[in-house]
């Protein structure tokens, strides 16, 4: 991630990460202060998470994850990471049945708390009405979506790692998705690095199906949006 995220200039505290076993942990301290300080930090963190999902997927490493919020303790040199948000994120992540990520209730509650604070702001800044201006809900990197779990789909909030993340973070080192065959595109990533998917492996095939369905919907909608903004429609 280092050297790619220009949005880090907007955040007072950088996003950190460490890896243990097959787990990647992204974490970021929330700065104390008003929503005008906290909202950019959240946007940068979500950008980092979405970029990690996309970068790993492009390299044939489909990830799944969850974003939580709360008090935690971390000691990287000992691989120690504890706290309620760790448990919540692990529980939600482990039950998902796709390559993707969702926002946990604790994080969503925090977003809405900052949204309410943002709507109470008064005044103007360079002609912009400050009421709602710093709302963290004004972010293209999440979408309401039926999250696929092992038992069923549950309405929730998904992180967007389709081509919107490339434009959001001004990235040009990763090519946009150029195919409309999302099923084949996703399957190729799941089969990267010599992996094979057995015909009887219904569990993995369902993950591919769920991932392709999400990616297809998001990518198609985003392509139409870009065309409409450019006047091509």
Predicted regions and their residues:
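Catalytic core of nucleotidyl cyclases, primarily class III adenylyl/guanylyl cyclases
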Residues: 6-44, 53-84
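Conserved binding-pocket/active-site segment within a compact domain
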Residues: 81, 85-94, 113, 120, ...
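Catalytic/regulatory signature loops of cyclic-dinucleotide turnover enzymes
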Residues: 58, 64-65, 69, 86-107
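Homeobox/homeodomain signature
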Residues: 9, 14, 53, 91-93, ...
């Amino acid at each position: 991630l280092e050297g790619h995220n220009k949005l880090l200039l907007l955040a007072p505290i950088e996003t950190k990460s460490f890896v243990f076993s097959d787990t990647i942990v992204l974490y970021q301290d929330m700065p104390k202060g008003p929503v005008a300080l906290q909202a950019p930090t959240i946007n940068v963190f979500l950008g980092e998470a979405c970029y990690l999902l996309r970068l790993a997927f492009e390299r044939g490493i489909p990830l799944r994850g969850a974003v939580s919020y709360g008090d935690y303790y971390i000691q990287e040199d000992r691989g120690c990471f504890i706290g309620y948000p760790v448990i919540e994120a692990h529980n939600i992540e482990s039950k998902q049945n796709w390559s993707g990520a969702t926002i946990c209730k604790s994080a969503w509650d925090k977003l809405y708390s900052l949204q309410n604070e943002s709507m109470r702001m008064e005044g103007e800044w360079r002609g912009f009405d400050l009421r709602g201006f710093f709302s963290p809900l004004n972010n293209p990197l999440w979408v309401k979506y039926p999250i696929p779990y092992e038992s069923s789909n549950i309405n929730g909030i998904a992180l967007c790692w389709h081509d919107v993340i490339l434009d959001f973070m001004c990235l040009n080192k990763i090519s946009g998705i150029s195919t409309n065959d999302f099923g084949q595109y996703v399957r190729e990533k799941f089969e990267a690095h010599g992996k094979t998917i057995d015909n009887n492996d219904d569990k993995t095939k369902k993950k591919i199906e769920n991932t392709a369905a999400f990616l297809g919907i998001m990518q198609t909608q985003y392509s139409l949006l870009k065309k409409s903004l450019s006047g091509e429609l």
